[in-house]
Amino acid sequence: MDLTQLEMFNAVAEAGSITQAAAKVHRVPSNLTTRLRQLETELGVDLFIRENQRLRLSPAGHNFLRYSQQILALVDEARSVVAGDEPQGLFSLGSLESTAAVRIPATLAEFNRRYPKIQFSLSTGPSGTMLDGVLEGKLNAAFIDGPINHTAIDGIPVYREELMIVTPQGYAPVTRASQVNGSNIYAFRANCSYRRHFESWFHADGAAPGTIHEMESYHGMLACVIAGAGIALIPRSMLESMPGHHQVEAWPLAEQWRWLTTWLVWRRGAKTRPLEAFIQLLDVPDSARQGYQ
């Protein structure tokens, strides 16, 4: 097994095609096919499921991809450390939509300014999706609702979010779930931690939401609430950043439900130089930078 084989494997895993991967790594397709077969023989497992002209990762391939990505990232880091260079390489960050919108824009701008050699990418989604991306090696780190009790994850607390029940104008104050029992709610998909928190708030008071409408953005949720179609749960920081927030009522949850903490998490043992550089720009106490294990 050598680094070239790992680079080829990663390229095919990403492209799903020998031809496309060969163009990316500047090799002829037959060379990739031969080297991948050699790698599979050496490991004693099939890394890909071959379907006509397409390849998709087998379960063993998914597991191997995590390690292959970590190995190549560490090699890049070792090269830059020995050469005395500034941090460089790929850095893929995932984030909750609200965090990306109101918490980190200035940090991202400063990160890109300071480290132009880092190839940075950002994706957003619910906590469950972002955590899966980290565990699968697709993301170097992600902002999610935490803490996460997982043996393969490290992380640090970064932001404390106040959650608000958002209702149409004219609603009486909402202090408990029974007051909005049966109301239609607007939320993200079921793997969103805020949605699970919202539903738990209902159930703890012996209440239940009406129809749960799944939305793709907080802006869509707010528009539906403004129209009088239901209610939503939105972080105060996000709500106050959106046009139209003066057209709704907003009520903080009771204290035991009111606050959630956003964490930055990464795979254990995969704290690369780009990630360390990013953490240094976050406004978090030094005592929190060590995270948990």
Curated annotation (Swiss-Prot):
One of its GO terms (molecular function) is transcription cis-regulatory region binding. Residues 1-58 form the HTH lysR-type domain. Pfam families: HTH_1, LysR_substrate. Keywords: DNA-binding, Transcription, Transcription regulation. One of its GO terms (biological process) is regulation of DNA-templated transcription. InterPro entries: LysR_subst-bd, Tscrpt_reg_HTH_LysR, WH-like_DNA-bd_sf, WH_DNA-bd_sf. Residues 18-38 bind DNA. SUPFAM superfamilies: Periplasmic binding protein-like II (SSF53850), Winged helix' DNA-binding domain (SSF46785). Belongs to the LysR transcriptional regulatory family. NCBIfam families: PutUtilRegPtrR. This is Uncharacterized HTH-type transcriptional regulator YneJ. It comes from Escherichia coli (strain K12).
